[in-house]
Regions:
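An acidic/histidine-cluster motif and surrounding catalytic segment
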Residues: 167, 211, 231-235, 241, ...
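Short, acidic, metal-binding catalytic loop of nucleotide-sugar glycosyltransferases
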Residues: 22-23, 46-57, 67, 77-82, ...
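Short, flexible, basic/aromatic active-site loop/helix in glycosyltransferases
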Residues: 164-168, 179-205, 211-221, 453-473, ...
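A conserved hydrophobic helix/loop-capping motif in glycosyltransferases and polysaccharide synthases
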Residues: 28-37, 44, 51, 63-65, ...
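Catalytic phosphate/metal-binding cores of nucleic-acid and nucleotide-processing enzymes, i.e., regions
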Residues: 35-37, 42-44, 74, 78-79, ...
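Active-site-proximal specificity loops/subdomain of glycosyltransferases
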Residues: 70-134, 348-409
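Conserved donor NDP-sugar-binding/catalytic core segment of glycosyltransferases
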Residues: 129-130, 143-184, 427, 432-457
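Short beta-strand-to-loop acidic/aromatic patch adjacent to the donor-nucleotide binding site
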Residues: 132-146, 410-420
Length: 588
């Protein structure tokens, strides 16, 4: 690594000290093989355009076939628009047939499909060699390179085959750390420290796939081949395994780099999945990127490049709710933008509710609303009174409850602006609604996002209804369904006259709060509360994450502007109970 870095540095120093003009950027062939990728191409192509690399030093090699969507049209239109920017364009479309003879579905990888893709990749490799290209960049059409310096950074590693580690919603990534004697994936303890970036660098691995750079200037690269398989190859017919075996037989080591965040890609759907499943999975990838402080702006810029031209018109709706309320502080415009876009991508419409800014409330405001804190209330973690942020949060939800009652809204969805959606969120929410309606569940409130506090016993499941439980003591009001009857019950409790945080008030109202003294102030506690299980939304950030901001806990005490909360986040018991935002899922 030191030697490679020194070599690259010496080249840079030589260029800087030389009075002659600088060297041209290396010649790159970008090989793209797309099938049924209309849903991902606008973002993928936008990310390619945004790479900080001279376009006139890049040749595009693009193939597409066996499509049942408008992938061909999108690629053709894009190539026509950008062809003068790039050095060369090779375009290989094939309209028919729309399916392989031996595949039961579009997501099934049959032998004919594997062989076809390998032949296309080999054709791209041979074209790159004929053009005397310095590098071949292979990229799948749903891989989003949000780091604009990716190409330069990979080149600087001076490796024959090197991949940028791609992020996903699970532990899955575009490399293997282990391979069995038959060429299949093997779990190893080395994988997760690399995947989580607990160890950073460029690591020798037996397999990289999806997006990687091949240095054609290396002599050993002449022995690399995607097709046909090496004469000694006896493993399964799989394009990535065949190429990894070719690299092994050529004594070429594959590397994966995780020094930075380079980009994102979706977790592959199962072979029996539909194209719609894949579309929704990719939408979730977009939402995950928008939830990351590192990727949000890059994705926002690229998305608009093609959206208005090539994507079908999006018709947001309320999916059966009378209203969808999204709470947002006016000064948190970044959150508002992200949430509106996230909802739009899922074809969901909402009413933006301006949150009550607790910091802007003064003593006169509080007295005019006749607000009084619940006698004896202290935060269970910090032994402090209510904060102004918590007061503002409560009033924001309270105002929505009033609107639901005033408008007579039978069913509403209430969400906050700091949540991230689980994969297939819309479909799962619709299924939940259908189940509740079908079995005539008598409900007032259904959490779709929360922090369950009573973890020492299981919550009671609801007979005949999948994925719903009776809610026990819970924190957070990230998202919940509320009925008209539920809103009326909450208002009848007159909570402003005995105020406590909203996520403490709700468990009181469904008679599950562990502090009996609090419940004693509310005579009627008959709110019928349930929860989706598993949950449908989670926080965008957990305490301690980079980019974490709390508008409720880090503020002054509600009735004393001079008294700030001496809250040490690192020592917080709540922090310890929340834990970190760990990778969910498995490697595959």
């Amino acid at each position: 690594l030191v030697e490679a870095g020194a070599t690259f540095l010496s080249k840079i120093l030589m260029i800087l000290s030389n009075p002659e003009s600088p060297l041209l950027a290396p010649r790159v062939v970008l090989a793209v093989v797309c099938r049924n990728s209309a849903h991902s191409l606008p973002l993928f192509l936008g990310a390619i355009e945004r790479l900080d690399y001279p376009k006139d030093r890049v040749a595009l090699w693009v193939a597409t076939d066996h499509n049942i969507d408008n992938t061909t049209a999108i690629l053709r239109d894009w190539l026509i628009k950008v062809q003068n920017d790039y050095h060369y364009v090779e375009w290989r479309p094939q309209e028919e047939p729309r399916a392989f003879e031996d595949e039961p579905g579009t997501k099934h990888w049959s032998n004919l499909r594997y062989e076809h893709v390998m032949k296309l990749r080999q054709a791209a490799l041979e074209s790159a060699r004929e053009m005397w290209a310095d590098y071949l960049l292979v990229a799948d059409c749903d891989n989003l390179l949000t780091n604009t310096d990716t190409l330069w950074k990979l080149m600087s590693e001076n490796k024959t085959i090197v991949a940028p580690m791609l992020e996903s919603r699970a532990a899955y990534s575009n490399f293997w750390c282990g391979m069995t004697s038959q060429g299949y994936y093997k779990r190893t303890p080395a994988y997760m420290p690399i995947r989580k970036q607990e160890q950073r660098g460029c690591f020798a691995v037996p397999m990289v796939h999806s997006t990687y750079l091949v240095d054609l200037q290396k002599e050993a690269s002449r022995q690399l081949a995607f097709y046909p398989p090496h004469p000694e190859y006896s493993w399964a017919l799989d394009d990535v395994i065949v190429f990894a075996y070719s690299a092994r037989m050529a004594d070429v080591q594959m590397y994966v780099c995780n020094k930075e965040t380079y980009g994102y890609f979706p977790v592959p759907v199962r072979s029996h999945a539909t194209l719609q499943d894949e579309v929704e999975s990719f939408v979730h990838t977009q939402l995950e990127i928008m939830g990351e402080w590192r990727g949000q702006r890059a994705l926002t810029k690229t998305r608009m490049t093609y959206l208005h031209e090539v994507m079908e018109s999006c018709r947001p709706n309320k999916i059966g709710f009378d209203e969808v309320f999204m709470i947002n502080l006016v000064r948190r415009s970044d959150r508002r933008e992200r949430m509106l876009r996230s909802l739009y991508e899922q074809e969901l419409s909402c009413k933006v509710v301006a949150a009550v800014d607790g910091k802007a409330l003064n003593k006169t405001d509080i007295e005019s609303m006749r607000i009084k804190m619940l006698p004896g209330y202290k935060d269970p973690y910090h032994s402090r009174p209510l904060t102004k942020g918590e007061l503002g949060c409560f009033l924001s939800h309270y105002n929505i409850w009033k609107e639901i009652a005033d408008r007579g809204l039978q069913t509403s969805l209430v969400i906050e602006d700091d949540l991230r959606f689980e994969v297939f969120f819309k479909r799962r929410l619709q299924t939940l609604l259908q189940e509740v309606t079908k079995h005539k569940l008598d409900w007032d409130l259904i959490y779709i996002g929360r922090k369950r506090m009573q973890v020492d016993h299981q919550e009671k499941s609801v007979p005949n209804i999948h994925n719903i439980v009776e809610a026990d003591y819970s924190y957070w009001t990230l998202g919940y369904l509320l009925s008209l009857q539920g809103a009326q019950k909450l208002l009848r409790a007159e909570p402003l006259s005995k105020l406590l945080p909203v996520d403490e008030f709700l468990p009181v109202m469904y008679n599950k709060h562990p502090v009996s003294e609090y419940m004693g102030h509310f005579e009627v506690r008959d709110l019928r509360a349930f929860s989706a299980e598993p949950l449908l939304v989670y926080p965008t950030h957990y305490t301690g994450d980079q980019g974490y901001i709390s508008d409720t806990e880090t503020s002054v005490v509600w009735d004393n502007e001079a008294l700030k909360t001496d809250w040490d986040r690192a020592k917080s018991r709540k922090t310890q109970e929340q834990g970190g935002a760990e990778l969910r899922g498995s490697e595959l």
